[in-house]
């Protein structure tokens, strides 16, 4: 059975004609999956991977759009699956792009590390026909909602898949950061910055700051100070349902709240940052053979003894 659809060209992205080969039953719906493909526009390896993978993708699915500028509006149409070609940065961008319209994501790694975009193009070619027949599981990952509050008004907000971080700026004086948990003062940090990370983000900036790695399915957050003035300030794991509020007593001129690597806003004296569980989760497809410990072994070199190079 074959089908084709053409819906024209929209600024920033292209709706593609697509055809399905054999009719696949997507999760009992009696039809092939409807998919959107996302990728970084400036990566040559993304473009070459798309050219290579496109025939296989379209042979089993209905391609709604191929968007390499991250402008597709996910509120317009029902989409079953998003394929992201790139690295973990592209996965984070896709989470921002979908907003409250989160759709299951399958990541193909064309970047360097690839914690989230775990499948190589070769692995994808093997897994894709099985995925289209329902041989996968969906893992729901915690997301955070971050709000910058000034004069009791929310002036900026965003959702985070990795982390929200208060980061220092020139003249790089040490910061005094008050942390409130569920309305109660938890502690007062003296440090260069503070990270609130999800389990997904625990292997990012949090790990570099000495924080623990959390299993991705955990409903928890980790709060990690950056270069704390006192060694007794250690990373803290708390429930994902805890509502946090952060306040910097005297921020520097460039002190900012940064969400998944993007500046949400610069902080002024009296500002507060609220961090709590987002109303939606980020959904990732997991194919057979994937698991957290395998990813850690392969990506962090937890494979056993390191071979010593002969001098």
From Swiss-Prot:
One Pfam family per UniProt: NAD_kinase_C
InterPro entries registered for this protein in UniProt: ATP-NAD_kinase_N, ATP-NAD_kinase_PpnK-typ_C, NAD/diacylglycerol_kinase_sf, NADK
A cellular component annotation (GO) from this entry: cytoplasm
EC number: 2.7.1.23
GO molecular function annotations of the record: ATP binding; metal ion binding; NAD binding; NAD+ kinase activity
Catalytic activity: NAD(+) + ATP = ADP + NADP(+) + H(+)
Gene3D superfamilies xref list: Probable inorganic polyphosphate/atp-NAD kinase, domain 1 (3.40.50.10330), Probable inorganic polyphosphate/atp-NAD kinase, domain 2 (2.60.200.30)
Protein family: Belongs to the NAD kinase family.
Protein name, UniProt field: NAD kinase
Native species: Rhodopirellula baltica (strain DSM 10527 / NCIMB 13988 / SH1)
């Amino acid at each position: 059975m074959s089908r084709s659809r053409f819906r024209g060209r929209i600024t920033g992205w292209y709706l593609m004609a697509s055809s399905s080969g054999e009719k696949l039953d997507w999760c009992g719906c009696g039809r092939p999956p409807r998919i959107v493909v996302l990728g970084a526009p400036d990566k040559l390896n993304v473009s070459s991977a798309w050219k290579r993978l496109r025939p296989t993708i379209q042979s089993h699915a209905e391609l709604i759009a191929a968007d390499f500028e991250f402008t597709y509006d996910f509120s317009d149409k029902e989409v079953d699956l998003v394929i992201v070609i790139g690295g973990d940065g592209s996965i984070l961008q896709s989470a921002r792009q979908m907003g409250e319209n989160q759709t299951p994501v399958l990541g193909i790694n064309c970047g360097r590390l690839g914690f989230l975009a775990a499948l190589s193009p070769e692995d994808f070619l093997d897994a894709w026909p099985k995925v289209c027949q329902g041989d996968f599981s969906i893992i729901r990952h915690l997301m955070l909602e971050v709000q910058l509050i000034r004069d009791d008004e929310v002036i900026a907000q965003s959702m985070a898949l990795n982390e929200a971080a208060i980061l220092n700026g020139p003249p790089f004086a040490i910061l005094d950061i008050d942390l409130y948990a569920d309305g109660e003062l938890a502690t007062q940090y003296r440090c260069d910055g503070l990270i609130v990370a999800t389990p997904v983000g625990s292997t990012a900036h949090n790990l570099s700051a000495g924080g623990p790695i959390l299993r991705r399915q955990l409903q928890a957050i980790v709060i990690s100070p950056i270069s704390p003035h006192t060694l007794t300030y250690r990373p803290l794991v708390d429930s994902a349902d805890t509502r946090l509020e952060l306040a910097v007593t005297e921020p520097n001129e460039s002190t900012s709240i940064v969400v998944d690597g993007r500046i949400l806003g610069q902080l002024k004296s009296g500002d507060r940052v609220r961090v709590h569980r987002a109303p939606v989760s980020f959904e990732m497809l997991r194919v057979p053979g994937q698991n957290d410990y395998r990813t850690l072994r392969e990506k962090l070199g937890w494979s056993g003894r390191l071979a010593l190079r002969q001098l």
